[in-house]
Amino acid sequence: ESDNFSTDRPLEFLQYDHHQLAKSDFCKFLGTPRSIFYEKSELDKREIAVQNTTPSELIKFMHEDVLDIITPILARIYTVTTPKQETFEIPAIVQTGAKLYEEVSDLNGIAIPCMYYDEIQRKWNNDNRSVLFDMILERFITIEKPHAYLKEAVEKVSETMTSITDYLYGANVYKAIDEHYYSKLRQIDVEQCTWLSDEDIEKCKLRIHEVISQDCESNKPNAEFCIIHNSEEEKHQAIDQILDDICPDNLRFRFTARVDLETDNYIYELKCTSELSLEHRVQVVIYAWLYKILGYPEKTFRIFNIKTGEMLTLDASIEDLSMIMRTVVKGKYTNTKRLDDDEFLQSQETQETQEM
């Protein structure tokens, strides 16, 4: 009633807990009664920013300090399973209607594998819809306000893709959606998607078949297998825990990662380029790291270059994969301090010790 003397105490109802108040006849208790109260951390009180990303986006423009650390590891964890063979003379640069020149190796690398995927998928079912069409549709429906030009381009894509032109145009549309960049799509219209011949396609499909077919005899392979999507919060919990100490307090990553082909024993990433690059290797490392962290069945990851016949196999511990993944993420989204000579030598000694 008052606070004038040491013996004064609050009125009895002021000492009630949630459950007592809920049972009282003088109080209308709203909400759920609680007995235990936790103090919110500063992180809980701040709004968490979400960064949606993909392995392809992570590996763009890697800092030289990042390359200094990961290059020796990459050299150690990849082995050449099949050395380079005859290099196919597949057009990599084409002239557009505007008399400009565009690099199309990336489009070849999408279109040619999808032709093969459709061929083997149709052996298992009667669905004539192309894998590439589904890839385009899946990406397109996630765009909140697609540009009118992009809508028109998607409407031109063939659902069944019965010609080389259909696949090349579909690859161009897919790339535009994936990279949010429409320059190549504007330069190369559907009528200009004619740079690959039937002979080019047949020899490429034969080369893929010689590598993959034996692992597709018992079970249907999964083309464009999704390891994780940025909407899958539960899957990201394990990732958050591992990357927590290198991320800004209010930033969390949400990954979308799809591998080209999953078979009984292998995960394949297919390329169609003159040379497999360091970026290609890092991309597959990120796929493998996500795959292992999420507890998928053990499988071997491979990179196969359709143009040269070269195949690399990844053989890495989770420690190696995590070192590369953490280094790439840290270099991409946090401020990095350039290593001086002593620090760089120390990092190399640490890696050599781990290898022993």
Specify the residue positions occupied by each region the protein language model found.
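Intrinsically disordered, low-complexity terminal regions enriched in charged/polar residues
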Residues: 314-346
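Compositionally biased, intrinsically disordered low-complexity segments enriched
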Residues: 347-356
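Nucleic-acid nuclease catalytic cores
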Residues: 243-326
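Solvent-exposed amphipathic alpha-helical surface segments
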Residues: 211, 215, 294, 331-335
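A generic signature of intrinsically disordered, low-complexity regions enriched in glycine/proline
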Residues: 122, 138, 170, 182, ...
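Generic low-complexity, intrinsically disordered sequence content enriched
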Residues: 15-18, 294, 349
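Metal-dependent nuclease catalytic cores that hydrolyze phosphodiester bonds in DNA/RNA
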Residues: 1-258
